[in-house]
Amino acid sequence: VSFLLSPSAQPPPSPRPSPPPALWTPGDRPPDGYALLFPGTGASGGPGLGALAGSGPAAHRIVTDVLDAVQEGLPRDWPSLRRVLLDDPASYRAAARTPGVAQLADYATSVAVDRVLRAAGATPGFAVGQSFGEIATLVSAGVFTIADGARMAVDAVGVLARHGRGGGMALLQTAEPRAQALIDRAGASGEVVVACVNAPELTVVSGPDDPLERVVDTARADGARATRLAVPYLSHHPAMAAAGDEWYAMVRDVPRRPLQLPVYSPVRGRAYTDGDDLPRALADCMAHPLRLPPILRAVHDAGATAFVEAAQGDTLCQCVRLTLPKARTWAPLHQAPRGARPRAAGPGPSNGRDAAASPQPPAAPTADT
């Protein structure tokens, strides 16, 4: 689900080269005032915390502390995240068969990246959460504890498993107006909806399986690249309103503190305030669409010095570069290919390369659940 399995999944890469891979190294940090990006989870393809924890004793201590705090919020019968992400990463694939493990692994990774960067002296000025990533965003902003965020995520997994089956999501490489026109042409209006706009020419649609397939076929016949995402649920769809209400009832009384960082929501279309019912806002992610480009522009206009992906990979950094070609982006855990020598992320666009040189989206990931 985009709320669980990131709708930022993209179609196969074009022949144009992707940005150079990079891993974070101690002493390498973005300029103060950067915007943290927290993607929807489940699309990273596996654990990436080992590289972060291995970057130095301080980072290792922070990562293990975060994993222990996340574990505190998990059911007792869940696998140990410290074991499957750090001590025995080869066991991760088997552990990820437990519903929600992949999503909580990504949640832990997002929180850990944020904490390690701050410990290195980098001070964020903004945070943007995409779908499920809004939970980690509000943890980063000091609203919820790490353990409470984990509990909320586990509850969301259960609700979506009960309510969201029988549908899915597809990515259309086209702008929102054309995507809506393709839905109409496929005779799927009211069943398939625009769920997520990730970049000016990247639109995710969601709906029941049969009409969703008609939209995909119609898009391809019209010359648009269309990819059915490995997402076994509806998400960002009006049919999930009851699921959102159920989850809200479960999390509405979670203790919260005032925002310590400006948080921008692509679902609400603005920055949150302390007067907002934030659990309600999170629950709305299940049924309401998100539009990322206007939020990225708003954060940029508000003074963000760079955009930093608090996750494994660089999916949202790619969306930034498609929306703001001159923006500076950092992907601390953009994994290097096997056998490649890790390179520190540089301060310039796309880790040191001109952003305009590589605006193409990355390959679509397979689902972890």
Language model feature labels by segment:
Residues 165, 196-202, 230-233, 258-259:
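Short Gly/Ser/Thr- and Asp/Glu-enriched loop/turn motifs at secondary-structure junctions
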Residues 175-176, 207-212:
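Helix N-cap motif at beta-to-alpha junctions
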Residues 179-200:
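Gly/Ser-centered flexible loop/linker motifs
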Residues 183-186, 212-222:
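Short amphipathic alpha-helices in soluble, non-transmembrane regions
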